Structure formats: C-alpha cells, structure tokens
C-alpha cells in the first residue's frame, strides 16, 4: 500500500465519512433540494421572457399585451420568492425523519416558527415622496425568498431538535386508543409546537429591543454577510471546490456535503442575478449554483467529460476504450459515477491530481472571463444540472453565445490537463493486457 493510499484511508476517509453521515448536513442538503422543482419551473418562464428570436417580443405583445414580460414574471416570482419557506419545511422534515419522529408535524411547526421570526413589514414609498416608510401587515416576499435562507435553515434545525427532544422524552398529550392516528399525531405535536413558538416569540421580543430589530438582520449581519463574501470570492470558491474534489477522491459524494453548506450562499447569489436580469440591470454575482454546475463541472464533478473524450480518442487499452464508450452517454448529461468508480479515480493517486486541478483552473478561467465582461454571467436561470454542455451555457446566461463558448474553452483546458495523466494510466493498462494476452504475467 502506497503512503498516499494509507494516509487517505487512515486519516482523511474516517473524517470525511463522519462528515458525510452527519444528519444535520444531510438534512440541509436534502431539504434545500426540495426547492429545486419550483425553481426550475420558474426558470422556464424566466427563459421565455428573453428568447433571442426575431419578432418574438412583438408576437408575445400581440397575445398578452405590452406588459407580457411582467405577466410571465408571475410564476417566476411565485416560485423563487418562497424558497426560504419551502426550505424551512424541507430541512425540518428531513431532520425529523432521520430521528424517526413525525416529520410532517416538524415541518409545519418549522414554517410557523420561521414566519413568527419574520417581521410582517414592507417598504412603501408614498406618492410624491422620495423616501420609503415601513408599513405593517404585509408579507415581506424578499425574506421568504433567498434572503431568508439562512434564517430558515437555523429555525428548521433549532425547532426540529426541540421537537424531537420533547417527543423522545414522551412529554406529549396521549390520546385514547380509539382516536384516528392522524388526530393522535396532531395532538402529540401540541406541546413541542407550543414550546417552540413560545421560544421563538420570546427571542423575537428580545431582538426587537436591540438595534438589529429582527432575527433576519442578526443572521444577515453576523453570519450571512461574512459567508456570502467568502462564497462569493475567487479564493473561497477555490477552497470549496478543492474540498469537494478531495471528498470525491475518497469515494464520498463531495457535491452533497459542500453543496449543503454553500447552497444558501450560491442560491442567494443566483436569485440576486435573477432579480437583476428581470429588471434589465447589471448582474451582480459570478459565483452562483449554476456557475459550478454549468461551467466548472462539465461532465460531472472534476470536469470528467474531457477525460471520457480522451479515452474515446486516445486509448490503447481495450479496457479504457470500453469504459469510454460506456461513459460518454452519462457524461454528456453530467453523470460521471461510472468513471469515478469504474476507472477508478477514487483512491487513485495518479488520476486524483488532474481530478482536483482541472476544476480549480476552470474556476479561475471562467472567473476571469466573466469579471472582464468577455463572458456573460449566469442570469439566475436554474438550468437543470443534467442539461448537456453548450446548450446549458447558452440558456444559463439568458441566451448569450459567450456562455457556450466558455464551456468549450473549459473543455479544451481540462482535456489538456487530463491527457498526460491519462496516457500514463492507459499505458499501464495496455501493458497489463498485453502481459495477459502473451501469457507472461511478470511483464509490467
């Protein structure tokens, strides 16, 4: 066993395994994923507002009127602007499910606690005035969307931990045996639900006595802003990608773990770009969820489409040629488990090097392209991660060819990175096959 393999197995894999199995991180990941169907549906309507087809705008105006773009925005806003509320339910549901307690009740209580922590005030600018005032009684849509994700996460984890503790301590109302199960479960949730609401209410009253005024401001200033700066920077993104690739190298789904941590940051950046795109303003963010899914991980984590193409074109080994044929179909849809585990890349010191380096270089190249204005930034459109390259880059930028061109550039970069390492691996496999065919098992 090589020193590298021994260090990976003895030092890194145990820690990575514990992180991967951590129930709270799993709940964050799986709970936030619950928002994706709605976001993708909203993104379809967002794409329809900006199709670069001659005569398209005139046709839409003739059908829906001059405000057709605003009308297409209705389902966009309805899906994006409840992101935090859906996440509050989903995270609580998944965490309660992992504890074996009633997940539906936990999710409902989490939503109530989240809304209780959210001030029902909206800014209003009176006619003829240049300054806005806060008016009570309105639902603050911005806080129910991406801006409220951090609070939704914390509330969901906090409320579910209290909920399961009280349930497991059996501090509940017990109904007679003849009561229907659905009714019985609802009464079981009464005491933990009351305690959670009471605690969140008291916390809100205390916070309102401070300059912060709301939990959203506390979390935004103390947690959200620093993390957003980190996740929205080149250095922070390189670190996140490096850790993700290192976890994959141990056979652990790095995207699930790092995605669960960084999702609220990158989702928030995505939504900020979406709002700017709808308003026709400059897009503020580069590092969003789509930045990594569309431009960095072309072919899957580690940008392995380049490796598969190299296998198809340059393999001497029969095993590598066959694996390339099997892997090209999934790779075009950004699915690369057959390559990661079949080649394998996992626990393979030779191939781990380009597997880690390739996405780090494409992050840097794409950042340079977007920051200089040569490449359009992601427009906040949630293109499915399984969308084939070139098409996905075009759609994710709101119909800009530069998005597809950047994907092609990244593919060429990653081909150049993988090629020398693959040649060594392919030659080794070819010699092993030659030894078997010649009957000389000692040939290396």
UniProtKB/Swiss-Prot annotation:
It comes from the Bacteria. Its main location: membrane. Keywords: Cell membrane, Membrane, Sugar transport, Transferase, Transmembrane, Transmembrane helix, Transport. Disulfide bonds: none annotated. One of its GO terms (molecular function) is protein-N(PI)-phosphohistidine-sugar phosphotransferase activity. Pfam families: PTS_EIIC. PROSITE patterns: PTS_EIIC_TYPE_3. Residues 8-421 form the PTS EIIC type-3 domain. The phosphoenolpyruvate-dependent sugar phosphotransferase system (PTS), a major carbohydrate active -transport system, catalyzes the phosphorylation of incoming sugar substrates concomitant with their translocation across the cell membrane. The EIIC domain forms the PTS system translocation channel and contains the specific substrate-binding site. This is Putative permease IIC component YwbA. The gene is ywbA.
């Amino acid at each position: 066993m090589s020193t590298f393999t021994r260090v990976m197995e003895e030092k890194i894999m145990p820690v990575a395994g514990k992180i991967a199995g951590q129930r709270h991180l799993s709940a964050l990941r799986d709970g936030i994923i619950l928002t994706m169907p709605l976001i993708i549906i909203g993104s379809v309507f967002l794409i329809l507002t900006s199709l670069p087809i001659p005569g398209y705008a005139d046709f839409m105006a003739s059908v829906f009127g001059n405000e057709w773009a605003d009308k297409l925005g209705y389902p966009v806003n309805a899906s994006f602007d409840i992101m935090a509320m859906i996440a509050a339910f989903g995270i609580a549901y998944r965490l309660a499910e992992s504890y074996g307690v009633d997940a539906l009740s936990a999710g409902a209580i989490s939503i109530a606690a989240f809304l209780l922590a959210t001030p029902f005030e909206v800014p209003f600018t009176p006619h003829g005035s240049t300054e806005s005032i806060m008016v009570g009684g309105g639902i603050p849509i911005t806080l129910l969307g991406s801006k409220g994700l951090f609070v939704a996460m914390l509330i969901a984890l906090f409320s579910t931990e209290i909920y399961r503790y009280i349930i497991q301590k059996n501090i509940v109302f017990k109904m007679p045996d003849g009561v229907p199960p659905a009714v019985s479960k609802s009464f079981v949730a009464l005491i933990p639900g009351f305690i959670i609401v009471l605690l969140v209410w008291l916390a809100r009253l205390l916070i309102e006595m401070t300059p912060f005024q709301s939990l959203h401001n506390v979390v935004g200033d103390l947690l959200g802003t620093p993390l957003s700066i980190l996740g929205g920077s080149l250095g922070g993104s390189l670190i996140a990608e490096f850790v993700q690739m290192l976890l994959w190298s141990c056979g652990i789904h790095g995207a699930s773990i790092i995605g669960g941590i960084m999702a609220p940051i990158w989702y928030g950046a995505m939504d900020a770009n979406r709002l700017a795109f709808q308003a026709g303003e400059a897009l503020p963010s580069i590092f969003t969820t789509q930045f990594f899914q569309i431009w960095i991980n072309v072919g899957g984590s580690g940008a392995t489409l380049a490796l598969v193409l190299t296998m198809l074109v340059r393999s001497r080994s029969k095993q590598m040629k066959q694996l390339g044929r099997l892997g090209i179909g999934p790779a075009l849809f950004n699915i690369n488990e057959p390559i990661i585990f079949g080649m394998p890349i996992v626990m393979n010191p030779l191939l781990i090097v380009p597997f880690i380096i390739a996405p780090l270089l494409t992050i840097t190249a794409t950042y340079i392209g977007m920051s200089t204005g040569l490449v359009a930034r992601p427009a906040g459109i949630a293109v499915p991660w399984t969308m084939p390259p070139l098409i996905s880059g075009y759609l994710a930028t709101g119909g800009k060819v530069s998005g597809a061109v950047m994907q092609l550039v990244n593919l060429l970069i990653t081909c150049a990175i993988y090629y020398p390492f693959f040649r060594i691996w392919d030659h080794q496999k070819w010699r092993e096959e030659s030894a078997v065919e010649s009957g000389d098992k000692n040939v290396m």
